[in-house]
C-alpha cells in the first residue's frame, strides 16, 4: 500500500515537506520500500492516514534513494518513523532509551493513532518531548 502514500524523492522534497506544514504534524517513514518490515509499517500508515488527516500528514522516504539524512538521523534500521512539527524534530519517550524515532514496525493501528495524537497535542503546547501513551521498554520478552 506504500504507493498510496506520498513519496519524497530528494532531500529538498523532505526539507520542503517539513518546512511547509505549519498546522499538522509531519510523520516521515524512512526505510526501504521493498523491505518486509517497511511494507507492514506502510500498510498501517496507509490505513490510519485518513483518520489522522486533521493532525498529521504522512510521507515515505526510501533511504537508498534519498541517503541525505542517513547519518544525520542515524537511519540504520529497517524502518524508522520520525515526527516533525513546524520545522522542529519532535521526540517521544517510548521507554526504549531512544527518544528520537520509532525504529520497529508498529502493527497496531490504534497504537499508532494514539502516538500521533499524543505528539500532536504536545507539539501544539510547545513541548519538544512527549511521553508515549504506552511503555515499550518491555517490548522484547527475554
Swiss-Prot record:
The superkingdom of the source organism is Eukaryota
Keywords attached to this Swiss-Prot or TrEMBL record, sorted alphabetically, are: mRNA processing, mRNA splicing, Nucleus
Main localisation: nucleus
- Record's Gene Ontology CC terms? spliceosomal complex; U4/U6 x U5 tri-snRNP complex; U5 snRNP
GO biological process annotation, one example: mRNA cis splicing, via spliceosome
Where in or outside the cell it occurs: the entry states: Nucleus
Under Gene3D superfamilies, the record lists: Glutaredoxin
Subunit architecture: Interacts with cut20.
- Could you say which protein family the record assigns here? Belongs to the DIM1 family.
Job of this protein: Plays a fundamental role as a protein essential for entry into mitosis (G2/M progression) as well as for chromosome segregation during mitosis. May play a role in mitotic spindle formation and/or function. May have a role in the maintenance or establishment of the steady-state level of the APC complex.
Q: What is this protein called?
A: Mitosis protein dim1
Q: Which organism is it from?
A: Schizosaccharomyces pombe (strain 972 / ATCC 24843)
**Source organism lineage?**
Eukaryota, Fungi, Dikarya, Ascomycota, Taphrinomycotina
Amino acid at each position: 500500500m506504500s504507493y498510496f502514500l506520498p513519496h519524497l524523492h530528494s532531500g529538498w522534497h523532505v526539507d520542503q515537506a517539513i518546512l511547509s506544514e505549519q498546522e499538522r504534524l509531519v510523520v516521515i517513514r524512512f526505510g526501504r520500500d521493498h523491505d518486509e518490515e517497511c511494507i507492514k509499517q506502510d500498510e498501517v500508515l496507509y490505513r490510519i492516514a485518513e483518520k489522522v488527516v486533521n493532525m498529521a500528514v504522512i510521507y515515505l522516504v526510501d533511504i537508498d534513494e534519498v541517503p541525505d539524512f542517513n547519518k544525520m538521523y542515524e537511519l540504520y534500521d529497517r524502518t524508522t518513523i520520525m515526527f516533525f512539527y513546524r520545522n522542529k524534530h519532535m521526540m517521544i519517550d517510548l521507554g526504549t532509551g531512544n527518544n528520537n524515532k520509532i525504529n520497529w514496525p508498529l502493527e497496531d493501528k490504534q497504537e499508532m493513532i494514539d502516538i500521533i495524537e499524543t505528539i500532536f497535542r504536545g507539539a501544539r503546547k510547545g513541548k519538544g518531548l512527549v511521553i508515549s501513551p504506552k511503555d515499550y521498554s518491555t517490548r522484547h520478552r527475554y
